Structure formats: structure tokens, C-alpha cells
Design a protein with these regions (language model features):
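Mature catalytic core of soluble alpha/beta enzymes
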Residues: 1-322
């Protein structure tokens, strides 16, 4: 006799746009609830805290204010504290105060020109996450010129907020992907296997995207930072969008991409950015000191061939394409 209780319901898929990118969410719910409207409403509020491209957001108000801001929403304090933690742990490689440098190099909304070194030196005098003070209800500038770029933290934090909200609704098996990063909880019940996430090949172009690796994940967050499509060409030379806050110039390393796996997505997000800034050699050394992190790094060897490095914790779950 056919037993209906052994069947698994079809997953519910929700997708949309947020933070200048797209999101895709898959989850299983015996009640068959579609949470798209609630998720969109939640992301609108999160954007009102952390979206640099919304001139009315809290982070934008901080950037245009000379002294700082009081928090109106509950979504800015947590990523600010995480940024502070990784700023110190990475020796300043992750630093959200690079915003004026991002704009100077034309990665913001302005014109693409190469700034001269004197302008860079001038901007560097007010770059540094130690130039802000975070309290439970406010963010204060120690220098009126300080500005924050949440590009290396916002999407990961947004994915965490959505995943936490879904879990609060009793969802135990879900995959949240926001702008290529996200969190995998439980299993893909349709096939009773871990969730599978693809990692882009660094040779991908915007028009032709293909995967270099597939990773099987359960109860783990993931993010990949790379300069796949995001670079500027000035006078025939390509510059990566990853700014080194120590030099003020785009980071020049052999690293092609950094995929990081952690307990939460905001942690994975900030460390992936930090690894792109510091390069694969320093990243490998730092990973030895941080057993809570796993990573898959792709980089160019001296002969121009692509190499990979994986931490032991993630290696059994990675399938590399030839």
C-alpha cells in the first residue's frame, strides 16, 4: 500500500532583488507557506540600515554627517561590531572606512580616473576603523571625514537576517543565497542530501559564468570574494575593486578568489574580503590561527597556472572541476 507520509513536499522557492543584486531562497515547509512578501519587507528595513546606495539609509546618513548618528533600526550595530572584531584580527586588512578610497578610484558612482599618490596619502590620514566609536545606540566619528563602505559586509549580514527569520518560523531546512553568498541549514530534503553550492571559476566573465568547484554544506555559511567582473580599466591597466586600506591602492596579489565557510554569513563575508586584501600567503597563515574558519582559495602560481588551497575542514566536501 502506498504510504503518503514517506513523500517529501516540493521545496518552496523565493527570489527577488535587494542590495543591488538578487536573492534566491529554497526551503521546505510542511505548512506550504510562501514568505516572499515578508522577506521582501524585512530586506527593505535591513537596507534602510546598511545600504550605501540608499541616500536615506543609516550608513549613508553617517557618511554625510560630521559627528555621527544615533541608531534608529536594530540592523547596524551587529555588523559594525563584527567589522571591528575582524579589523583587529586581520591587522586592518578588513576596514569599512575605505569608502573615500573606493570613490577616489572610481568604484563608487563617480568617474574612472587614477588618483595621484598625494591625494591617496591625504585620504589615508582619515582611513581607519579606529576612527569611529561604536556604542549600543550610536556610531560616532572621531574625524568628520570618515565614511563607511558596507559593500564587504552587507550582503552576508542580510543573508543571516533572512535565515534567522526563517528559522524563527520553524523552518529547519533552507538555503539562502544573496548576491552569491549565504547560508545552508539542514538538508535538501528532496534528495535527502546536503545543500550544494557552486563556486565560480575565476576565468568566468559576466556573460559566461561557470563553476570551478561544488561544495556540499549543512549548517554552514558561505561567501566568495573575487574580482571576477568588478574591476576598472584606467589607461589600459586593470585595477581590482579590492582596496588595500594600508596603501590606499587596489590590492595587487596572485589571489583570484577567496571562498570562506563559517558559522554565520557575516563572518564569512568579512574574512573573504580580508583575504582578498592580504593575498593567499598571509591568508593561509591566518587560517591556521582560526580553526573556526574554513576556506577554498584560488590563486595564480608563478608560472601563471591556477592553484587551489583548501583547509582540512572543508576539503572532504569540495568537488573540484578539472
Amino acid at each position: 500500500m502506498f504510504n503518503r507520509s514517506n513523500e517529501v513536499d516540493e521545496p518552496i522557492r523565493v527570489e527577488g532583488k535587494t542590495m543591488g543584486t538578487t536573492y534566491h531562497i529554497t526551503y521546505f515547509d510542511k505548512k506550504g507557506r510562501n514568505f516572499k512578501n515578508s522577506i521582501d519587507s524585512l530586506l527593505i528595513v535591513v537596507n534602510k540600515s546598511i545600504n550605501n546606495y540608499d541616500p536615506t539609509s543609516e550608513v549613508s546618513r553617517f557618511n554625510t554627517n560630521t559627528t555621527g548618528i544615533k541608531f534608529d533600526l536594530p540592523y547596524l550595530y551587529a555588523p559594525l561590531k563584527k567589522a571591528q572584531e575582524v579589523f583587529h584580527a586581520s591587522d586592518g586588512a578588513f576596514d569599512p572606512t575605505v569608502m573615500p578610497l573606493v570613490n577616489a578610484w572610481g568604484f563608487g558612482p563617480g568617474k574612472q580616473i587614477q588618483p595621484d599618490s598625494s591625494k591617496i596619502d591625504s585620504i589615508l590620514s582619515f582611513v581607519g576603523y579606529d576612527k569611529v566609536r561604536i556604542t549600543t545606540d550610536s556610531l560616532v566619528k572621531k574625524d568628520s571625514r570618515v565614511q563607511l563602505d558596507f559593500g564587504g559586509i552587507g550582503q552576508g549580514y542580510g543573508a543571516d537576517v533572512v535565515a534567522d527569520w526563517l528559522r524563527s518560523k520553524g523552518i529547519t531546512d533552507l538555503l539562502v543565497e544573496l548576491g552569491g553568498e549565504g547560508i545552508a541549514i539542514g538538508k535538501n530534503l528532496k534528495n535527502n542530501v546536503p545543500w550544494q553550492v557552486g563556486i565560480l571559476d575565476p576565468n568566468s566573465t559576466y556573460e559566461n559564468q561557470f563553476f570551478k568547484a561544488y561544495v556540499s554544506l549543512t549548517n554552514k555559511s558561505f561567501t566568495t570574494s573575487g574580482n571576477y567582473f568588478n574591476y576598472r580599466e584606467i589607461d589600459g591597466k586593470k585595477y581590482s575593486h579590492t582596496i588595500d586600506p594600508e596603501t590606499g591602492f587596489p590590492a595587487q596579489h596572485a589571489i583570484l578568489s577567496a571562498s570562506v565557510f563559517a558559522a554565520d554569513c557575516v563572518t564569512a563575508d568579512v574574512w573573504a574580503t580580508a583575504f582578498m586584501v592580504m593575498g593567499h600567503e598571509k591568508a593561509i597563515e591566518l587560517l591556521k590561527q582560526h580553526p573556526e574558519l574554513d576556506a577554498l582559495l584560488m590563486f595564480s602560481s608563478t608560472d601563471g597556472k591556477m592553484q587551489t588551497y583548501m583547509t582540512r575542514g572543508i576539503e572532504p566536501f569540495v568537488k573540484l572541476e578539472p
